[in-house]
């Protein structure tokens, strides 16, 4: 008895579905133009929805690929109500990094990338290349925790060292190991660069670019307070309070010696500091 009721129910549903489909196609035949417009409208709406969701996901996960992204901060200078700037001078960055044991590592990146012209020699044959490069201090590999496929987080410690993204290493050296290879500058006055490491490419939604990272000269603007041309990032210990780090620096840094006797942190016409977490950098506006 139960099986009979079950099969009758299935047959009824099948008849209902056939009726719905018959009516649907009947409407399509009678109102072709309206039906086509409705289908097109739904298709466009679906595509627009998918594009919006892809953009939302791209922005929401920006810089989230970096390990401990929430512990990485960019140090910004705030000019009262006039806005802020993300470029720092090297001696200021050095003083800030050394101001607290809560800061595990700090690094500088030049405010822009540059194109480098170089060649490699293989069996007496030269092959020339032009690739983008970013001049950085060695700590960048530890602050951002590069996923090193060859080499280590100390790969930029020596002068003239470079690390390459995996895609660039394969482009230049194929399946051979890139470590130890020389990139000879087209400028005869410049020393050759030595590949000391290869890192896994960053995703597109990352503040870091898939370029050659070159080790900054230890002498470059080392004590130059007038050269503000670097992005400055620090990595704090897990669970550390950024407000505590800033307060500690302001209390112990001799700002009057660096900026003048009338300097006071946070005054309307003076300077203040801000630590912007790495995932928030993408969304921050009004920053020079």
Language model feature labels by segment:
Residues 16, 23, 47, 51, ...:
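Amphipathic alpha-helical recognition patches that constitute DNA-binding helices
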Residues 3, 15, 26-27, 35, ...:
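Membrane-interface anchoring determinants
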Residues 16-20, 84, 270:
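Juxtamembrane loop-helix boundary motifs flanking transmembrane segments in multi-pass membrane proteins
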Residues 17, 88, 129, 224-226:
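Residue-level signature of the cytosolic catalytic core of signaling kinases
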Residues 1-5, 9, 134-150, 162-288:
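Mid-to-C-terminal secondary-structure elements
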Residues 49-179, 185-192, 246-247, 251-262:
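Structured, solvent-exposed hinge/loop segments at the ends of secondary-structure elements
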Residues 2-46:
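N-terminal Sec/SRP start-transfer signal
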